[in-house]
Amino acid sequence: MEFVKMHGLGNDFIVVNAMEPPLLDREDWEEIAVRICDRHYGIGGDGLILLFPSDKADIRWRILNSDGSEPEMCGNGIRCLARYVYERGIVAKRRIEVETLAGIIVPEIITDAAGAVTGVCVDMGEPRLQRHQIPMVGPEGPAVNQELVVGDAVVRVTALSMGNPHCLIYVNDIDEAPVTTLGPKVEVHPAFPAKTNVEFVQVVAPDEVQMRVWERGAGPTLACGTGACATVVGSVLNGYTDRKVTVHLAGGPLHIEWREENNRVYMTGPAVEVFRGELPL
């Protein structure tokens, strides 16, 4: 099996073209993801990205976490996929429609004057704010600055969906955020029947925040694109920031804009190819 290792701000993925047999016909990708994402016994990665044909968009993808679970969306991963298909001529246009479990997502390739790819801007769609859309247990309506009992502690959270569930917790010092202690508890909290990603956020300025993430199915990662988008939406709803914000993650910055005129969220950031290889299955 040929693969390409890529990353978006250190959130790293193994990308595989499975558009033709025999890879197209395989039904054990979840097991393969666990094996090859292992950083000691496999290639190593936060997830496995698979490319398939689509009758609804230019291409269809599957993304599998390192534990074999399948999230609805992944912002950093979709940027990597966009660069992968563009540079290989699989999709011969800059604006690429991708069929995902969260609907049709549209990344757009950004190039310099010489035509080299410098980044990807992704139309991430509209945020989903109602509890049943996240999903989150509780009375219908948005979940903004709500109390959540986690063990013996009570924390204030803001929850929403960017195609996948996110729970934001605001902190005074991002370096002291309890990512690895509180994060896994909130991920599996009964309030979130599909589990949730957990973002810890420090507001720096109206146009700047810092964020750390505990990803559902992957644990702590260097970056989370949908999490950065959710962070900006939640911060606007709380009155903490403007609609155009730079989100600083452990792996680097993402530029997020929640446009008022169409209610859609746009994410701009890098996608980098690290190496290529071949692995027997």
From Swiss-Prot:
Q: What is this protein called?
A: Diaminopimelate epimerase
Q: Kind of enzyme, top EC level?
A: isomerase
- Assembly and oligomerization: Homodimer.
Q: Name one Pfam family in it.
A: DAP_epimerase
What does it catalyze?
(2S,6S)-2,6-diaminopimelate = meso-2,6-diaminopimelate
Could you tell me which InterPro entries the record lists for this protein? DAP_epimerase_AS, DAP_epimerase_DapF
Q: Which SUPFAM superfamilies match?
A: Diaminopimelate epimerase-like
**Active site per the UniProt annotation:** 74 (proton donor), 224 (proton acceptor)
Its main subcellular localisation, reduced to a broad class, is cytoplasm
Gene Ontology MF terms in the entry = diaminopimelate epimerase activity
Amino-acid positions noted as binding substrate in the UniProt annotation, renumbered to this chain: 11, 65, 75-76, 164, 197, 215-216, 225-226
Of the GO CC terms on this record, one is: cytosol
> Can you tell me which family this protein belongs to?
Belongs to the diaminopimelate epimerase family.
Residue numbers for the site described as Could be important to modulate the pK values of the two catalytic cysteine residues?
166, 215
Task: Say if the entry is tagged with keyword Amino-acid biosynthesis.
Answer: yes
List, in alphabetical order, the GO biological process terms annotated in this UniProt record.
Answer: lysine biosynthetic process via diaminopimelate
Q: What is its EC number?
A: 5.1.1.7
Cellular location of this protein? Cytoplasm
- Biological function: Catalyzes the stereoinversion of LL-2,6-diaminopimelate (L,L-DAP) to meso-diaminopimelate (meso-DAP), a precursor of L-lysine and an essential component of the bacterial peptidoglycan.
Pathway the protein takes part in: Amino-acid biosynthesis; L-lysine biosynthesis via DAP pathway; DL-2,6-diaminopimelate from LL-2,6-diaminopimelate: step 1/1
User: Matching NCBIfam families, A to Z?
Assistant: DapF (TIGR00652)
Q: Which UniProt keywords apply?
A: Amino-acid biosynthesis, Cytoplasm, Isomerase, Lysine biosynthesis
Task: Give the source's domain of life in one word.
Answer: Bacteria
